[in-house]
């Protein structure tokens, strides 16, 4: 092989190894939904793709039938925040798996983890019920049942309102039983269930009726109530003591005023008996 060709080949191989090493050094982007990934039909969701500062271009991709399709791209300058993508008018075509990818120079780097978005409202709603009262103590158990009398769903999912990830409670039974427990205070919240089919796992039914679970720590509440009672009694005692002190002060002030009046004004008989004073038609009272 010609020396020039050998040198050129070495440069190409070294450059390729350097690029691969650089790609391995950069972290993969992070994808997240700013709200719940369970989105009603025609609703919207905001997706954020976090990448390193050196990334000048971020792409959002949807995976359909093992094929990547670009949903959008954002240019980012050095000091700008991570780009956000808004998915409007959610429907069956936009539900599915999403990933982010960023670029540095002319090179593409690896994809982020997968974010799954679900659209609801495509089938009739199921019914959610409980096997006991909805107020529980920590450590107790409860079972929620999701069923549909007219639609033969393959699977059901139980979702808690406010969660920013897909429901972890899934069942292939019909009706589906979801056991919660032993519960703690974090289990409190509003729950709904959904039905869906295995062939289209990102297309869900309307949400069921809502059930609100309340986990209460009665021991802590009793302790708090007792403290409130003690504080109220102490407050009443303090008010009573203040009232007694104020009354005593008023009584003492009135007595001092009467004593001062007796000293300052001599009696009528004492005035008549002073030497050199005579009063007409005055009975003799001086002795």
Swiss-Prot record:
Gene3D superfamilies given in the database record: Immunoglobulins
Extracellular side: 22-227
Signal peptide annotation: 1-21
InterPro entries the UniProt entry points to: Ig-like_dom_sf (IPR036179), Ig-like_fold (IPR013783), Ig-like_Receptors_ImmuneReg (IPR050412), Ig_sub (IPR003599), Immunoglobulin_dom (IPR013151)
Glycosites: 65, 79, 141, 177, 186
GO CC annotation terms, alphabetical: extracellular region; ficolin-1-rich granule membrane; plasma membrane; specific granule membrane; tertiary granule membrane
Keywords, in A-Z order: Cell membrane, Disulfide bond, Glycoprotein, IgA-binding protein, Immunoglobulin domain, Membrane, Receptor, Repeat, Secreted, Signal, Transmembrane, Transmembrane helix
Disulfide bonds: 49-100, 146-193
GO biological process, one term: cellular response to type II interferon
Tissue specificity: Isoform A.1, isoform A.2 and isoform A.3 are differentially expressed between blood and mucosal myeloid cells. Isoform A.1, isoform A.2 and isoform A.3 are expressed in monocytes. Isoform A.1 and isoform A.2 are expressed in alveolar macrophages; however only one isoform is expressed at alveolar macrophages surfaces.
Keyword Acetylation: no
Gene Ontology molecular functions: IgA binding; IgA receptor activity
Domain Ig-like C2-type: 42-107, 139-200
Cytoplasmic side: 247-287
Transmembrane parts of this sequence: 228-246
Domain of life according to the entry: Eukaryota
Function: Binds to the Fc region of immunoglobulins alpha. Mediates several functions including cytokine production.
Subunit organization: Associates with the Fc epsilon RI gamma 2 receptor inducing tyrosine phosphorylation of gamma 2. (Microbial infection) Interacts with Staphylococcus aureus protein SSL11.
PANTHER family (UniProt xref): IMMUNOGLOBULIN ALPHA FC RECEPTOR, MHC CLASS I NK CELL RECEPTOR
Protein name per the record: Immunoglobulin alpha Fc receptor
Species classification: Eukaryota, Metazoa, Chordata, Craniata, Vertebrata
Gene of this entry: FCAR
């Amino acid at each position: 092989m010609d020396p020039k060709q050998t040198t050129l080949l070495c440069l190409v191989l070294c450059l390729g190894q350097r690029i691969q090493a650089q790609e391995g050094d950069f972290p993969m982007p992070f994808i997240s939904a700013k709200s719940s990934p369970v989105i009603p039909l025609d609703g919207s969701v905001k997706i954020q793709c976090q990448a390193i500062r050196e990334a000048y271009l971020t792409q959002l991709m949807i995976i359909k039938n093992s094929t990547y399709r670009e949903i959008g791209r954002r240019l980012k300058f050095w000091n700008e925040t991570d780009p956000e993508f808004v998915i409007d008018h959610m429907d069956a075509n936009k539900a599915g798996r999403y990933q982010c990818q960023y670029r540095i120079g002319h090179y593409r780097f690896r994809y982020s983890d997968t974010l799954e978005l679900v659209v609801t409202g495509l089938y009739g709603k199921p019914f959610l019920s409980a096997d006991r009262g909805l107020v529980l103590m920590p450590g107790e158990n409860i079972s929620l049942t999701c069923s549909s009398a007219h639609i033969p769903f393959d699977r059901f999912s139980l979702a808690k309102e406010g969660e920013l990830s897909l429901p972890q409670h899934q069942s292939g039974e019909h009706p589906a039983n979801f056991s919660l427990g032993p519960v703690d205070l974090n289990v409190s919240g509003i729950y709904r269930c959904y039905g869906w089919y295995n062939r289209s796992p990102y297309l869900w039914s309307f949400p069921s009726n809502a059930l609100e679970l309340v986990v209460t720590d009665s021991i802590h509440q009793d302790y708090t109530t007792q403290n409130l009672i003690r504080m109220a009694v102490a407050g009443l005692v303090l008010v009573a003591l203040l009232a007694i002190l104020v009354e005593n002060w008023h009584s003492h002030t009135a007595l001092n005023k009467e004593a001062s009046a007796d000293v300052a004004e001599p009696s009528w008989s004492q005035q008549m008996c002073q030497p050199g004073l005579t009063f007409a038609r005055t009975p003799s009272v001086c002795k």
